[in-house]
Amino acid sequence: MQMNILFFGPNGSGKGTQGAILKEKYATPHIESGAIFRENIAGGTELGKKAKTFIDRGDLVPDDITIPMILDRLKQPDCKNGWLLDGFPRNRNQAVKLDEALQEAGLGLDIVIEIVLDREIAKNRIMGRRLCVNDNNHPNNIFIDAIKPNGDKCRVCGGELKTRSDDQDEAAINKRHDIYYDVVTGTLASAYYFKELAEKKGKIKYLTLDGSPSVKEVTQELVSKLK
């Protein structure tokens, strides 16, 4: 079953984890907008060179560079049976432009997924992350009962734990969440554009998931709704 999917969720919602699970289960590439920029810049593509001039100045890359870059990635052979796009769009105007560009390219969306999570819970999850020095993939979080560390040691292997500085920067977390949770000019505004399309035209399916349960429970709900 081909699925062209757009994924929304705040930092701390487990969006990246669920994206990785879908990638494995359905052999669907999980494409992050940030990775597209890095690949194009590293590869020295024309679009990458243009994007780099803006990034080097600390400016946002214009949509007329970003969207063609995304389309180029979605046209790659590994996306022929579907794809999962994460990290773009981030406002309603970008959503409209992306929707139009996808349709013109024959890459119309099938499904939009929104992981819903209370903002305070999302922030606590980020600040509660602890990284195992032996393996970053060992999940430890002081605010999630199912994966609480064993004291100050990794719950999986007993290794030492550390924190990432950006996970403890509450001001930076709040700034990212300000952008995401803004339903007028932020990321949720772009998600709701697609929700309106789903309700009015019925051409795409809009799925909402409760992000508060365990990873396993969220995955079960997601897989069930994708059937």
Where are the predicted features?
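Glycine-rich phosphate-binding loop of ATP-dependent small-molecule kinases
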Residues: M1-K227
